[in-house]
């Protein structure tokens, strides 16, 4: 089974993604900010991270940089940002 970490500060988004992905048989882990995501990755084998860019404490970019220090797990950003200057 593949484990997916969903990291978003909006509980409704985490819940919606969790319901959708868990129904396909993925192991789902939740984090509500960057620090929680990093802690979860230290304790659990994660195969994919779905992460919001705008979060309190550590934003998605800062969190990804920290994740990259120890892991090459794929990170997919989810965001409401839509302007050209917001592109990563």
Q: What do the PLM-derived regions correspond to, one by one?
A:
Residues 62, 69, 73, 82-88:
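Alpha4 helix (beta4-alpha4-beta5 surface) of REC/receiver domains from two-component response regulators
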Residues 55:
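Receiver (REC) domain active-site loop signature in two-component systems and cognate sites
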Residues 8, 52, 79:
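Active-site residues of response regulator receiver
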Residues 30-48:
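Acidic, metal-coordinating helix/loop segments flanking the phosphotransfer/catalytic sites
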Residues 11-29:
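Two-component/phosphorelay signaling modules centered on CheY-like receiver
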Residues 32-36, 59-62, 86:
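Acidic catalytic/metal-coordinating carboxylates
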Residues 42-46, 66-73:
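Conserved phosphotransfer cores of two-component systems
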């Amino acid at each position: 089974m593949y484990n997916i970490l969903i990291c978003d500060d909006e509980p409704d988004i985490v819940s919606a993604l969790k319901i959708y992905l868990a129904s396909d048989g993925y192991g789902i882990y939740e984090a509500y900010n960057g620090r929680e995501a990093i802690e979860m990755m230290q304790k659990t084998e994660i195969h994919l991270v779905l992460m919001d860019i705008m979060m309190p404490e550590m934003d998605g970019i800062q969190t990804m940089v920290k994740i990259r220090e120890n892991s090459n797990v794929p990170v997919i950003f989810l965001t409401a940002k839509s302007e050209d200057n917001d592109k990563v």
